[in-house]
Amino acid sequence: SGHHZBSTBZASZSSKPCCRZCACTKSIPPZCRCSZVRLNSCHSACKSCACTFSIPAZCFCGBIBBFCYKPCKSSHSBBBBWN
């Protein structure tokens, strides 16, 4: 199992940490939290992932960082997100 950190974007997009909904406090350093709900798992860099017991499970990441991850690229192009 070769694990390459510096893989290209062609690797699996879903394994890269990303977040569509992220909010930060105005403190210094900022406290940022991803509020995006994902099905069955959290993003790859999440340390404290919490999931519901439903099927499929709804998971969210409880980590607090001083930055936001880049928005996730979706499989279909939604250009509307950038307006």
From Swiss-Prot:
Keywords: Disulfide bond, Protease inhibitor, Serine protease inhibitor. This is Bowman-Birk type seed trypsin and chymotrypsin inhibitor. Coiled coil: none annotated. Belongs to the Bowman-Birk serine protease inhibitor family. The record marks K26, S27 as: Reactive bond for trypsin. Disulfide bonds join C18-C72, C19-C34, C22-C68, C24-C32, C42-C49, C46-C61, C51-C59. It comes from Vigna unguiculata (Cowpea). The keyword Disulfide bond applies. One of its GO terms (molecular function) is serine-type endopeptidase inhibitor activity. The keyword Zinc does not apply.
